[in-house]
Amino acid sequence: MQFSRVLAALCGVLLCASGLFAASGDFCDSSLCLNGGTCLMGQDNDIYCLCPEGFTGLVCNETEKGPCSPNPCFHDAKCLVTEDTQRGDIFTEYICQCPVGYSGIHCELGCSTKLGLEGGAIADSQISASSVYMGFMGLQRWGPELARLYRTGIVNAWTASSYDSKPWIQVDFLRKMRVSGVMTQGASRAGRAEYLKTFKVAYSLDGRRFEFIQDESGTGDKEFMGNQDNNSLKINMFNPTLEAQYIRLYPVSCHRGCTLRFELLGCELHGCSEPLGLKNNTIPDSQITASSSYKTWNLRAFGWYPHLGRLDNQGKINAWTAQSNSAKEWLQVDLGTQKKVTGIITQGARDFGHIQYVASYKVAHSDDGVQWTVYEEQGTSKVFQGNLDNNSHKKNIFEKPFMARYVRVLPLSWHNRITLRLELLGC
C-alpha cells in the first residue's frame, strides 16, 4: 500500500539519521525491528519491519490488541477473535459470547422480559395442561389459567390431578418467541404448602413435536431445581435461549401436590422488545402529554394527568383519563430520540371504584411531533384490541416495527371513561 511505503520511508529516514545503516539486499539489520521483527529492505532502500504475531507499528514497537480490546461487547459478554491473517498484526473478525438473557451482535439486546403470565398479556385460552385437580368435593378447580405468578385467592394456582402420572402445563405464545428463562412459585392448598421440587422444560414450534432441554453433557433431559416452599420465587435461565411457540413444564418431583404459579422470560424473536421507559420512569413526566386531562370533582388535586399513564402505576389516581369521551383524544409519548418501536402494552384503571379502560385504539407515530403517520397493516390503519378490565395487561405487537421519536395512542372505544396506563416496547 502507498501509505505503508510512505511510513516505511519515513522510518528509514529516521533510522538513517540516527546513524543506523542497513546492509544491502532483501534483508536488513534485524536490530532495527523490535520484539523479534524481521527487517526487510525495499527497492528504494526503504526499510520495512515484518512483525511477529501480537505486535504492530513501524518497528514492531506496539502491542497488537486486536478487535477485542477494548471489548466491543456489552453486558460483560466475552469477545472472541474468530479469524486472522496468520500475520499476527491484523485481526479481522470477532464474535460476542452473550451471557444468558442477552442477544444481538454485541449482546446489546436484553431478552429477559416477563412474557405475560403475571400481567395477563397471555390469555387464559393460551394456557393448557394435561390434567386439573378438583378439590373440595369437586367444587374447586385448580386450572392451568390460574398458574400466574403472584396470583392470590383461595384457589390461585394450577394443580395436576393426583392420578396424572406424567403431568404438564403448556403456554402457547401464538407466534415464535425467544424464551430465556422461567420463574416458578408454589401455592398453599387447604393450608398446606405444595410446589414443584424439580421439573423439565420442553419446547415446540408446532405444538406436536416437543424437544426437552438437554443437560450439560447432552446425554439426557435437564432437570431444573424448583421451589422449597409455597411462596418464594425460583428463577432458572436457559442457556442457550429457546426459539419456540410452545413451552411445556413437566413436574418431576413435587412436595405433596404438583402445584404451580409461574412466569416465562424472554423477548420477541427479533430481540427488540425491551420496555422503553414508561414503567421505570426513564421517560420523564414532561415527555408524556395528552389532548386533555380529566379532574375528578373538577379539582386539580384529583387530576388524571398524562404523566400518570405508566404501566402498573399505583395509587388512587394512577392513570391518564381524557376530559371527554371523544375519538379526538390522544395520549402521546416523546421517546427523546428516535427508537425502533415493536409493541405496546395497555392497562385500564379505577376511578374511585369505577372500572375504566380503552377497549380499542389506533397508533400514530412521528419524527418531529408535527407530521403524523397512522400505523397500518395490509394497507389499512390497524385497529388494536385493548383491555377488558381495569388491571390486566393487553400486549399488541407491531408486525411492521417502525422508527419514531413520538408515539400517540388514539382511543376508538372505551368503558366508562377513556383511561389508560401503558408501556411501549422496542430498542
UniProtKB/Swiss-Prot annotation:
What subcellular locations does the record give?
Membrane; Secreted; Cytoplasmic vesicle, Secretory vesicle, Acrosome membrane
Q: Where is this motif: Cell attachment site?
A: 87-89
**SUPFAM superfamilies given for it?**
EGF/Laminin, Galactose-binding domain-like
- Glycosylation site list: 61, 230, 280, 390
Q: Which domain of life is it from?
A: Eukaryota
Locate the EGF-like domain: which residues?
24-61, 64-108
Q: Which residues form the signal peptide?
A: 1-22
Name the membrane topology term.
Peripheral membrane protein
Q: Where is it expressed, tissue-wise? A: Spleen, lung, heart, brain and muscle.
Would the keyword Repeat be found if you checked this record's keyword annotation? yes
Pfam families to which the protein is assigned, alphabetical? EGF, F5_F8_type_C
GO MF? integrin binding; phosphatidylserine binding
Record keywords, A-Z = Angiogenesis, Cell adhesion, Cytoplasmic vesicle, Disulfide bond, EGF-like domain, Fertilization, Glycoprotein, Membrane, Repeat, Secreted, Signal
Q: Tell me, which GO biological process terms does this entry list?
A: angiogenesis; apoptotic cell clearance; cell adhesion; positive regulation of cell population proliferation; response to estrogen; single fertilization
| Entry's Gene Ontology cellular component terms | acrosomal membrane; external side of plasma membrane; extracellular space
What intrachain disulfides are recorded? Answer: 28-39, 33-49, 51-60, 68-79, 73-96, 98-107, 111-267, 254-258, 272-427
Q: What is known of its domains?
A: The F5/8 type C 2 domain mediates high-affinity binding to phosphatidylserine-containing membranes.
Q: What does this protein do?
A: Contributes to phagocytic removal of apoptotic cells in many tissues. Plays an important role in the maintenance of intestinal epithelial homeostasis and the promotion of mucosal healing. Promotes VEGF-dependent neovascularization. Specific ligand for the alpha-v/beta-3 and alpha-v/beta-5 receptors. Also binds to phosphatidylserine-enriched cell surfaces in a receptor-independent manner. Zona pellucida-binding protein which may play a role in gamete interaction. Appears to participate in the O-acetylation of GD3 ganglioside sialic acid.
In Swiss-Prot or TrEMBL terms, this protein is called Lactadherin
Q: What is the lineage of its organism?
A: Eukaryota, Metazoa, Chordata, Craniata, Vertebrata
Q: Which gene encodes it?
A: Mfge8
